[in-house]
């Protein structure tokens, strides 16, 4: 996913500007009911040397006016960007990154908020690492769930640690990224799509050579009943289907497929299996066979010998059954899914056959 702003320009965009320790970028779209709480939590940070970049992604409510008021109220601390075209959260974050002055860059969603010590704790723990993160809260309308993250021990990224980090840390909130690291590897978000986080998370994890974890829990990741992640029968869910191919294509373009083939294949196959079972089947009352057919054709094009890959063999039997069914017939996949208990029966039979072969 190549940046629209040429890399040399991004490198030189801040010449003559004083750097700050941390830039926090907030994409904003029709967020008038949440934005105040979010911004106030950022203004309350105990680390003073920060900037807050609010990117209005063509809002139709009062969000843009709220940002302008904050710019006047706290000039220099808050910077507003006003887009005339909606380019989704990924595009809004990219525009913020283009002007960010921070040694480190972090991202906060406009309906989330953070604890006062977040920036200080992350910045002091980072100590020059490519990225630094922390545990966080899942906030279900005030009901908090503690989420612990596994960054592994140490500072340097080893092959085993990278694999573990990729499999267990699929988010980017409650993290900061060293700006020079993002610039060096031209790390950006895909634009005009949802689920852009999976792409960014994977590429940053593949390029990072150092990471650390700060002690504490600072980020409140808000989950309402109306969030895209929790809505059934929402066509936006299908935007997930494009992400595995975006990742595969970008990894090949960057040479990461050649240098980390097994990791890339594992991520690709895991996402495609999730797209079959979760996105296409579980999230819709009437699963779309054409969408399953798109996944089938993508796998045939990208991984025609998928059954030979360790990335396939190490997945659960249930996921492998659904994948094999989809590759055989998307229509059959839907019929089997609707027949309660049929996949579970197939799992039992497959395990029994496997045990007999070992005798």
Residue ranges and their predicted role:
Residues 83-100, 107:
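Glycine-rich, basic loop-to-helix element that forms the pyrophosphate-binding segment
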Residues 217-224, 231-258, 274-306:
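Catalytic core of nucleotide-sugar-dependent glycosyltransferases
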Residues 30-44:
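Short, well-formed alpha-helical segments that are part of the catalytic scaffolds
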Residues 20-23, 51, 199:
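Cell-envelope/extracellular polymer assembly enzymes that use nucleotide-activated donors
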Residues 41, 48, 56-66, 85, ...:
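A conserved acidic beta->alpha catalytic loop
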Residues 34-36, 61-70, 113, 117:
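Acidic helix N-cap motif at the loop->helix transition within catalytic regions
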Residues 282-359:
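Membrane-interface aromatic/basic loop that binds lipid-linked glycans or pyrophosphate carriers
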Residues 89-92, 110-214, 222-235:
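Donor-binding/catalytic cores of nucleotide-activated saccharide
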């Amino acid at each position: 996913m190549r940046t629209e702003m040429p890399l040399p320009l991004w490198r030189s965009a801040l010449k003559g500007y004083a750097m700050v320790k941390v830039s926090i970028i907030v994409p904003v779209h029709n967020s008038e009911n949440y934005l105040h709480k979010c911004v106030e939590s950022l203004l309350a940070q105990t680390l003073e040397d920060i900037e807050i970049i609010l990117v209005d992604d063509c809002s139709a409510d009062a969000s843009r006016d709220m940002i302008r008021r904050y710019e006047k109220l706290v000039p220099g601390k808050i910077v507003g960007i006003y887009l005339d075209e909606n380019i989704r959260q990924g595009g809004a974050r990219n525009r913020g990154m283009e002007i960010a002055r921070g040694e480190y860059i972090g991202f906060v969603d406009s309906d989330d908020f953070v604890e006062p010590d977040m920036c200080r704790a992350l910045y002091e723990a980072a100590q020059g690492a490519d990225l630094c993160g922390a545990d966080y809260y899942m906030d279900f309308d005030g009901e908090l769930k503690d989420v612990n993250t596994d960054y592994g021990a140490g500072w340097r990224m080893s092959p085993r640690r990278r694999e573990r980090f990729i499999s267990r840390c699929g988010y980017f909130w409650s993290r900061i990224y060293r700006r020079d690291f993002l610039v060096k590897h031209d790390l950006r978000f895909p634009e005009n799509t949802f689920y852009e986080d999976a792409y960014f998370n994977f590429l940053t994890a593949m390029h990072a050579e150092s990471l650390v974890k700060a002690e504490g829990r600072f980020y409140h990741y808000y989950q309402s009943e109306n969030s895209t992640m929790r809505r059934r029968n929402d066509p936006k869910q299908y935007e997930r289907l494009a992400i595995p191919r975006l990742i595969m294509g970008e990894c090949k373009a960057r040479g990461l497929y050649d240098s980390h083939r097994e990791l890339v294949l594992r991520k690709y196959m895991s996402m495609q299996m999730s797209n079959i079972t979760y996105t296409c089947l579980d999230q819709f009352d009437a699963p779309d066979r054409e969408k399953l057919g798109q996944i089938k054709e993508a796998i045939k094009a990208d991984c025609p010998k998928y059954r030979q890959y360790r990335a396939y063999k190490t997945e659960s039997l249930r996921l492998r059954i659904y994948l094999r069914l989809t590759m055989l017939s998307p229509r059959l996949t839907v019929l089997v899914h609707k027949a309660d208990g049929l996949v579970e029966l197939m799992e039992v039979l497959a395990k029994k056959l496997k045990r007999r072969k070992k005798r």
